[in-house]
Amino acid sequence: MSIKSQTNNMRRLAALLNINLCNIHGKKECGPNGSKQVFLNVGKVFLRALARDLGLREVTVSSNAGGIGVSGECSLIGMWENGGLYVSISQPACGSGKVLLYRTVRHSRDYKGGYNHFITRHELEKWSYTHLLDALCALRKDWESDEQAA
């Protein structure tokens, strides 16, 4: 996917995360619907292309719709040669605006990983796709320098 397409996907995700994805106006939920389903689909497309652009191997991209009270989440876990990256996109229930979480992982089943880093909805809306790639690649460089120091 092109940088322009991924930048558009970032903007689309930011717009979707700006609305209440868990509110369906008192109707019973029988699976994800409407904006929530669009969020889950766009999120997975975005993360698959992100993994490819970062050169990740052993990639798993998934989504979890959750229940009626949450937005659901899209996640990516992928490996480089000496470690990997976990990325999760969701709408925070507390309204903090932190919509994209990322951290290093040691292996593809590492759900603790390194320190959490966050990108806000506003940053997702304003940053270029290359800025996001640079932020994630910086984490990889930090990981590799920590490994060499140890």
Briefly describe each language-model feature range:
Residues 21, 54-55, 140-147:
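Generic secondary-structure transition motif, activating predominantly at the C-termini of alpha-helices
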Residues 73-134, 145:
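Intrinsically disordered, low-complexity regulatory segments enriched in Ser/Thr/Pro
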Residues 12, 49, 133, 147-148:
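N-terminal cationic amphipathic segment used for targeting or macromolecule association
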Residues 1-8, 141-150:
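Short intrinsically disordered terminal tails
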Residues 40, 47, 135-143:
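Charged, low-complexity intrinsically disordered regions
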